[in-house]
UniProtKB/Swiss-Prot annotation:
This is tRNA-dihydrouridine(47) synthase [NAD(P)(+)]-like. It comes from Oryza sativa subsp. japonica (Rice). Residues 1-91, 209-234, 257-314 are annotated as: Disordered. The active site is at C423. Residues 13-29 have a biased composition (Pro residues). The lineage of its organism: Eukaryota, Viridiplantae, Streptophyta, Embryophyta, Tracheophyta. Catalyzes the synthesis of dihydrouridine, a modified base found in the D-loop of most tRNAs. Specifically modifies U47 in cytoplasmic tRNAs. Catalyzes the synthesis of dihydrouridine in some mRNAs, thereby affecting their translation.
Amino acid sequence: MAATAAAAAAAPPADPPDSSPAASSPPRPSPEELVARAVAPVKPAFLRPPLSATPPKDEGKANGGGAVVAEKKSKRQLKRERKQEQKSSSHLCIEVGKSGNVSSCKYGDSCRFSHDIDAYLAQKPADLEGTCPFTNLDQLCPYGLTCRFLGTHKDIHAASGNLSEKHEINALNKDIQKLLWKNKYKFPKASAQIKLLGLKEVIKSKPDAANDDKKVNHDNLDGNDDENKEPLCNPPVNAECDSTLCEELDRSEGEPLIDNSIPCVEPRPTKKSKVESDEIDKHGAGTLNTNTESEDPNLSNGLEPSNNSSSCRTDLITTPHLREKKIIDFREKLYLAPLTTVGNLPFRRLCKTLGADITCGEMAMCTNLLQGQASEWALLRRHSSEDLFGVQICGAYPDTVARTVELVDNECSVDFIDINMGCPIDIVVNKGAGSSLLTKPMRIKSIVQAASTVTEKPLTVKVRTAFFEGRNRADSIVSDIYDWGASAITVHGRSRQQRYSKLADWDYIYQCAQKAPDQLHVVGNGDVFSFTDWNKHVSGCSKISTSMIARGALIKPWIFTEVKEQRHWDITSGERFNILKDFVSFGLEHWGSDSKGVETTRYFLLEWLSYTCRYIPVGLLDVIPQRLNWRPPSYCGRDDLETLMISDSAADWIRISEMLLGKVPEGFTFTPKHKSNAYDRAENG
């Protein structure tokens, strides 16, 4: 022991361990290893230490609000505050604001809003930088004194009759809304077709709608009628079913609330109606005598009679054959997917400027449209630049969907109507709509047959691979859906249960396309994030007409330019900022240039920025193109603006919005509606 200690003491001292960063840190994985682990291979020069994992207390707040939780107010308090706020000087009457003349309001002293112009101008916030979007269009601003760009107006006291020209269509007519509120809008085609298919229509349009013309045109549109308490339409039920099966309706969506103790009976057509349905499948036309006088649908709905000699007759319903319908060629066209919340009209208009060919509105619920809800009808708005435009609807029952299709066909200008049978969110699935229809193929058949025969416009269907993971069902309906009446089908390569936890299954999409008839357009959907992805998926199967672009367009809307020019665009922060400017300009033109319109534009801009922050510039990557499932490391941009744009902090998104729309109101907070940062977990609906 002593000898060992002496030898150790005599030995020279060991070199101290190297404490340099290069020696202490593990070797950096290669780009190939990072890609295999679904980590974005950012160049080492742009990497930086990760920030604190705990978000600051003022995350998503403009002015770093305190820790005190505000007490929740009752509905009575909120209503009282709304009334007081309406009478405040900050809420100037719309008509007075347009013309700058107090006497222009027809309600006079009984108006609910303020008529004090001097008080309004005294408390009005300072004008925003820039010019009024309507001035740039050489048009008079419809917001007059309330515009946040008032100083740039050429004539602030112009007559309201010379206001800006409308570039948007499909607005809800007030007379039509009144008929929908009273459940007096007639659906002759849908009612006849539902009866022809052997499905029972319990609630029908109220009679004597034609005699209510004066009432429709002169009554106030408050919707507080006794008739509005009744449901618009009931689900189709078998004539042999108990009539108490569907007594109650959910007021929020109008769908049936069936007692779980009673088994739900799928509607089955009678033998006679089955023969008639087969005749429709073979010949594309059906005739039904209802022993009622023929009438103009406009006249029956209390409107001006139509001059069209080919108006619909309720005693003779002739359903158009598929060959007689307008044909839309989807082949190799750039299709912007319908996107909830962020797929609004200004965003679609922006994508059109960047190269999109086909656009589709946000998903609208059938029952809400039939009830005349203005917020739902706003989803059907179309801009004049959208030359190939469709609307997407979602419903659970044949009669509801058929009525909605007939309503849209009569009142809106669209090129095609899409039925969403792939929506995965719970509030839709729990009502029997969306992806839950994949478990009911006979219901799908009834919906498509009923809807396709009430319109001459092409009908398309959007589905997922399946409802449950590993139980693919889409291929079982692709071969028949054309015979039922659909012109195209979009297959999203994920199941409802899977959501975004894995990459889209394009092999299964190709399998579905191989089973489709030649006349049916098959559109693929899932994980298209570059022009190479689009080329690969469209050329991977000759029966794939095109590929729908969804999240890829949200993260980088210039993907349409990349596909058309066949290049990876290393876009600069300045070019991206100009795109944001265009969106803000389109938003102010759509939602308004007053204070309310500015804040609405800000909200949708922030929702969109929660997606664009996922984009990694091409010049920062060792491997291109970027993939949707790549998780970005902590990195910085090539300049301060690019670094700000790649931040996933809501406070930084608010800072960007302030660069475009001025300071946010005091106490402003923002929380994204969608979890856009879902990379490998089933979070994002």
